[in-house]
From Swiss-Prot:
GO biological process: ribosomal small subunit assembly; translation
HAMAP family the record matches: Ribosomal_uS19
Keywords carried by this UniProt record: Chloroplast, Plastid, Ribonucleoprotein, Ribosomal protein, RNA-binding, rRNA-binding
Pfam families noted in UniProt: Ribosomal_S19
Record's protein name: Small ribosomal subunit protein uS19c
Function text: Protein S19 forms a complex with S13 that binds strongly to the 16S ribosomal RNA.
Gene3D superfamilies: 30s Ribosomal Protein S19, Chain A
Subcellular location as annotated: Plastid, Chloroplast
Predominant location category: plastid
Family: Belongs to the universal ribosomal protein uS19 family.
GO molecular function, one term: rRNA binding
Native organism: Chara vulgaris
GO cellular component: chloroplast; mitochondrial small ribosomal subunit
InterPro entries: Ribosomal_uS19, Ribosomal_uS19_bac-type, Ribosomal_uS19_CS, Ribosomal_uS19_SF
Gene: rps19
Amino acid sequence: MTRSLKKGPFIANHLLKKVHILNLEAQKKVILTWSRGSTIIPSMIGHTIAIHNGREHIPIFITDQMVGHKLGEFSATRTFRGHAKNDKKSRR
């Protein structure tokens, strides 16, 4: 179920403050965040946000095509190691 339009998008307060301060100072710094559920808004365009995936922070450069998506969509939490080539035990 999607979020109601009258509520607006969810953005963590600390992340919104950091982006706002960097926009006022016209600086480009990497912003560390653990808030994977925050929605990308137009004021974040051009910034690099390092999103935590459970083990490390992955830096993501925000572009205009990412607006409306969640930050967590751009940092995978699981590493796929590939399927087993000749695993005869699992066939039985």
